[in-house]
Swiss-Prot record:
Superkingdom of this protein's organism: Eukaryota
Pfam families, sorted: SGT1
GO cellular component: cytosol; nucleoplasm
Species annotation: Mus musculus (Mouse)
Protein name: Protein ecdysoneless homolog
Gene Ontology molecular function: any one: histone acetyltransferase binding
Segments of this protein annotated with the region Disordered: 499-521, 554-586
Family of this protein: Belongs to the ECD family.
Span list, region Acidic region required for transactivation activity: 502-531
Primary site of residence: cytoplasm
GO biological process: fibroblast proliferation; mRNA processing; positive regulation of transcription by RNA polymerase II; regulation of G1/S transition of mitotic cell cycle; RNA splicing
Ranges of biased composition (kind: Basic and acidic residues): 561-571
Region (Transcription activation): 439-641
Biological function: Regulator of p53/TP53 stability and function. Inhibits MDM2-mediated degradation of p53/TP53 possibly by cooperating in part with TXNIP. May be involved transcriptional regulation. In vitro has intrinsic transactivation activity enhanced by EP300. May be a transcriptional activator required for the expression of glycolytic genes. Involved in regulation of cell cycle progression. Proposed to disrupt Rb-E2F binding leading to transcriptional activation of E2F proteins. The cell cycle -regulating function may depend on its RUVBL1-mediated association with the R2TP complex.
Amino acid sequence: MEGSGKLAMVEDAVEYHLFLIPDKARGTEEHREILQKYIERIMTQFAPILVPYIWQNQPFNLKYKPAKGGVPAHMYGMTKFGDNIEDEWFIVYVIKQITKEFPELVARVEDNDGEFLLIEAADFLPKWLDPDNSANRVFFHHGELCIIPVPRKSERIPWLPMTPPTIQQALSIISAHPEAVLASESIQAAVDRRVSGYPERVEASLHRAHCFLPAGIVAVLKQQPRLLSAAVQAFYLRDPIDLRACRVFKTFLPETRIMASVTFTKCLYAQLVQQKFVPDRRSGYGLPPPSHPQYRAYELGMKLAHGFEILCSKCSPHFSDSRKSLVTASPLWASFLESLKRNDYFKGLMDGSAQYQERLEMAKNYFQLSIHRPESSLAMSPGEEILTVLQTQPFDVAELKTEEADLPPEDDDQWLDLSPDQLDQLLQDAAGRKESQPGPQKEELQNYDVAQVSDSMKAFISKVSSHKGAELPRDPSEAPITFDADSFLNYFDKILGAKPQESDSEDDPGEEDVEGVDSDDDVGFEAQESESLKGALGSLKSYMARMDQELAHTSMGRSFTTRERLNKDPPSHTANDNSDEEDSGAGDCAVEAVDVDLNLISNILESYSSQAGLAGPASNLLHSMGVRLPDNADHNPQVSQ
């Protein structure tokens, strides 16, 4: 973030920075204490939605980051989201809400792609904004997205720097001019659409399935459900060395397996299901035939057991759990626990009950990973945490087995298979399109104007493009198509040379031939030159007419659709110098004019139809110009009826 703002970031990771708007000068230690208090308040206030969340790799976390270079001291966090992009957008939602709850804070979010919020709103960005000048311009403030603009060349705004601002300048600008830096409504809507539905949307991203698991794993998941992610990743990223530990299980014996309900995220469930794996015969984790009604539960349990065994095999079974006690020994723990109680985190559960203890253990782990953040040398690995739970939290296999009869039903996993219609709907939702209405489809077919295709093509090619390429319409469904016929004809007149420009170049061959003549001769020469150009233009048109006449009788000429003649009689020719020349090669055959619009439309429709509903050159070209053709009613019985 220092300097140009380009970071060598970890792949599939999101970084977030929370700055305190400068209001007065503070000492380093005082600023540190203030930011630490903010970290405690933020993590406590948002604990009800952060604690139960199942993260793919790492949880949301904040820590104090001292000042460095031109970047002031601030709160900082980084989360590796791996394959689950929803973790990244959930963090965007949390950051957005933090700046809404704490208006004195300004936040920025970025990942290894840079300003990914701008990528999400790419269709609505102003032309001046590009990756080269976007450094330190995109922030969240008061829950709104802010983009610090660039002053125009024609105007000078004292508080806007001409170069990309530093972090200090950006914070001062946002503090002094919050309304002037708000992003446009379309950009705000594009980002809001991506984070809409949270926190309720978290529940929709979960999947509950039955798994035939060792009782020890069931007990661990009751205490620390977040360890499910580590186990799935261990199995998903296994190597032959990891599988050596799974030849003979030492921690999770297959004889202790019971049926249990496990809550996954959809990403974790898909990762576990899609991998084909045959266990070692020595492991004892045999599978029933695929036709068995509980085959999926056995398979999921076998894969999870391998993941947990791999994690435990990477640590010693004899270690001190003194690192765990560091959580309750922290001076922040007491105030954190008190804040959780004030925010009704325990949902009225009785102190000391089993469910109360489960939520308390979840809070301890959340506190350790997100607030306490011990040094890496003291941090516990997932395998050590699993063994700690097994050693400190006794469980009764018989009692867990009695819960098999009261398991909640499994969720349907049909969402793993997408139909073409569902895929189209997902693409439309991602692009921010409104849902198509099936009712007025027939009316849309009747009112569709085919001329829109040719008009769009003409309007597109008549525009002059910059060195960056052709500009496509941003919202073609709403903007009417405009076509200036005069400009279009003038453009081709210039190509054909109908309006030759006078040249003063010294390289003109005519000047060498008339060197030394007087002014009257100059006037005569200009008139002669004009007549010569007119004659050349007439010869060119005559040549093109004769070429059309010759091609008209070939297969190429017959492939074009011509206008129907209203008058079958041969057309009368006006007396001119070129009439005999034009007719001499044509004989008695008259050449009918080619209908350019009709040929253009018919060729595009033929190409579009041959795509059979798939992506192709015709649909891509038309969509880029804002033209969306209706479905072919000739091949759709429901529409034709």
